[in-house]
Curated annotation (Swiss-Prot):
Keyword tags: Cell membrane, Hydrolase, Membrane, Transmembrane, Transmembrane helix
Coiled coil: none
Chain segments annotated as transmembrane: 11-31, 35-55, 80-100, 101-121, 135-155, 180-200, 202-222, 226-246
MF GO annotations: undecaprenyl-diphosphatase activity
Taxonomic lineage of the native organism: Archaea, Methanobacteriati, Methanobacteriota, Methanomada group, Methanococci
InterPro entries listed in its UniProt record: UppP (IPR003824)
Protein name: Undecaprenyl-diphosphatase
Catalysed reaction, written as an equation: di-trans,octa-cis-undecaprenyl diphosphate + H2O = di-trans,octa-cis-undecaprenyl phosphate + phosphate + H(+)
Membrane topology: Multi-pass membrane protein
Pfam families: BacA
Cellular component GO terms held in the UniProt record: plasma membrane
Predominant localisation class: membrane
Species of origin: Methanococcus maripaludis (strain C6 / ATCC BAA-1332)
Compartment annotation: Cell membrane
Amino acid sequence: MEELILGVVQGLTEFLPISSSGHLAIFTAIFNATPDVGYFAFLHLATFLAVLIFVKSEVFEIVNGISKKDKEYINLASKLVLSTIPAVIVGLCFGDFIESVFSSTFLIGVFLSITGILMLLSDKLNKNLKTIKSIPYLDALIVGIFQAFSVLPGISRSGTTLFAALFLGMKKEDAVKYSFLMSLPVTFGAGILELQKVAFSTEQIFGFFISFLTGLLGLYLVKKMVIGGKLKIFGYYCVLASFFVLMFL
């Protein structure tokens, strides 16, 4: 039953800017269980499939553009690769430390409050100047650096990347697309690296499919909320969740 609940939690919170890793760690603490980082990573593969389906048209355009040697799409692909490098470096170099943070509900509570503040600020950012094709390489790197911090439970990957993209002047819909596209190699890599630690029980496999389905729901919801300027709702939620974690866990 725990695996199924964690599958729902992962699917819904992976793309909502409220930190899936933080919520997985919180629910693990509520269940009084040892954090299973391997299973958490396995669930990332489920949400990887969900986002791949959600942005399939954009992925096809990029692949097709690269095959035709279209400079515009080659540059976009290069920027996406650049955006993933900081998270890869942090994940490989500080993996043991990151795993230890999953057991610290205090740090998770603090990081959730940071995510909440970023979301409250995001709704005030509305420059709407740049598209995913027009952002400079420096912007791509900055968004990638923000993503690197999201390896910490409580820091939302979608939240930090959306905040960074909007702060740098990207259009809302393009910020959502870029955030989802740059999540593909990170979530896939996280899942593959820890795959050998997964027991592949019936409950875990079912949790995988539940995470996939709820991930699709989360994707549609966050796109609607970002475009509608309602990220502050997630901000208030994260602040309240932070208070709960710090006071009761």
